A protein has these predicted regions:
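Short, structured helix-loop boundary elements
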Residues: 34-38, 94, 107, 111, ...
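N-terminal helix-turn-helix
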Residues: 2-112, 273, 277-281
Length: 281
């Protein structure tokens, strides 16, 4: 894996936030075709994050700088349409929100090309296989072939997001960043302890990422959740740069780390190379 500084540091990093959602919406004042109510509704949806799944009206208003009355109307509309629910005080998103991005993610060239490859890998390995890209500080699942057995508490599907620092695909993608982009990531990322095994400091993660650069693959062993062991490899673009990651997730009680490397790694590398070849040749 090439970690030269010639890569565009913004290829995988989050774009800088230059204004609050409310300020960005205000910039379109005077445009007769701009729907402020729709823009506010989308801003309310984006206010929810993995670490803040339950928010009050006041919290959403603070995050977006949209007036509370407008936030309340947006939430009421989203509830009526089945995108949001409430316990009387806080609000949270419902799974229907995933449909907003699922159609796009599932129809991208990479997703369409990756799906049959993942299906074949999943059938060969009898484990769930996925492809993801880096979106801000998280990995975004764009294709997945699941198995009936759920591996973690979150039901993963196309559009799901997980923290990059403690997932195998995330570390593949972080290892592909140049030094400047990686520095920016560590300055803003919220590195939480998920299990007793989680590498959650820059000092521990940097040597790990350097090893990934050298060997070209990554195993994460029960750092996101106890029992989850996963292996990931890079998916390269036409110039040989990392554009995505492909992984297989297993339960630690079924598959040893040695078996992941011995039996699963060759098949996963072959799958990622096939995906790159079909996309760019």
């Amino acid at each position: 894996m090439d970690n030269s500084n010639s890569r565009d540091p913004h290829s995988f990093g989050a774009p800088p936030i230059i204004a609050s959602p409310a300020k960005r919406i205000e910039a379109f004042t005077g445009d007769p075709n701009f729907m402020t109510s729709l823009a506010r509704g989308l801003a309310v949806i984006h206010a929810f994050q993995e670490r803040k799944r339950h928010l009050t009206i006041a919290q959403i208003s603070h995050r977006t700088e949209i007036p509370r009355a407008a936030v309340r109307r947006c939430l009421h509309t989203l509830m009526k349409l089945g995108y949001v629910t409430t316990d009387g005080r806080t609000y949270s998103l419902l799974p229907k929100v995933l449909t907003l991005g699922h159609a796009y993610l599932s129809s991208t060239p990479m997703a369409l090309t990756a799906q049959p490859i993942l299906d074949r890998l999943s059938e060969q390995l009898h484990e769930a296989c996925s492809v993801a890209t880096l979106e801000g500080d998280e990995v975004l699942y764009i294709a997945r072939s699941a198995t009936p057995l759920r591996l973690i508490s979150v039901d993963l599907s196309v559009g799901s997001r997980l923290p990059a620092y403690c997932t195998s695909m995330g570390r593949i993608l972080l290892a592909a960043l140049d030094d400047a982009a990686l520095q920016e990531y560590f300055e803003r990322a919220d590195l939480q302890i998920k299990t007793s095994r989680t590498l959650h400091t820059r000092e521990k993660l940097l040597p790990c990422l350097e090893q990934i650069r050298q060997q070209g693959w990554c195993v994460v062993d029960q750092e996101l959740e106890v029992g989850l062991r996963s292996l990931a490899v890079p998916v390269l673009d036409a110039s040989g740069q990392v554009m995505a990651a492909m992984n297989v997730g297993t339960h630690a009680s079924r598959i040893t780390r040695q078996e992941l490397e011995r039996r699963f790694l060759p098949l996963l590398l072959k799958g990622s190379q096939e995906l790159s070849s079909k996309l760019f040749h």
